[in-house]
Amino acid sequence: MQAARAIYLVLDMQNDLVHAEGPNGKSPLGEQVRKRELLVKTARAIKKAREAGVLVGFVRVGFTAGYPECPPNSPVFSAAPANGLFKLGAWGTEIHPDLEQREGDIQVTKHRVSPFYATGLEAALRARNVTKIYCSGVSTQAVVQATVRDGHDRDYEMIVLEDLSCAHSDQEHENSMGSLARFCKVEKSDTVTFTNP
């Protein structure tokens, strides 16, 4: 039987959301990304996870031409077509260039907030016998919350790297982390020890 594995999922760290030249670069979210030094710290965490033999995966939100997968009634996504956001194949849906991707990393494209909804993520994790998920990204109140709750209910051990996640304000981030603490372990990137189960 294949040994149990862990993965570090990097959530929605794509140019449309975290690049200084992207549409959110001058928004409150962009300010939080810079203030919390998310890019440099996430790059360090990816390196640390790889050195520990932990798998790495990248999650992005994206829609094909014409946005057929985009939910028209969603307050989160319904404005994407009019604003040209999250177009697959475009610069905006590329993972930020400061975050090293390698061949063999798990790549997940999602059309909703949760990376588990209507994607191949769970099949990829089960095939690799992943039982523990480390995660971080933007935003805390959206993809991080959804990943933790959905992962918890699928019986994964969930760990959030708190300092590598952010929301549109400190208060939103803190409120989200407070509600997540029941469903996961909360760690800091400089003290976390990445381990396989």
Which residues does each predicted region cover?
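A short alpha/beta connector and helix-capping loop motif
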Residues: A4, G22-A49, G53-F58
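Short, flexible, mixed-charge acidic loops at enzyme active sites
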Residues: H19-G25, C70-P75
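Positively charged, low-complexity intrinsically disordered leader regions
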Residues: Q14-N15
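Active-site-adjacent betaalpha module
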Residues: M1-I7, R44-A52, F63, E69, ...
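Short glycine-rich His-centered loop
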Residues: L9, V18-H19
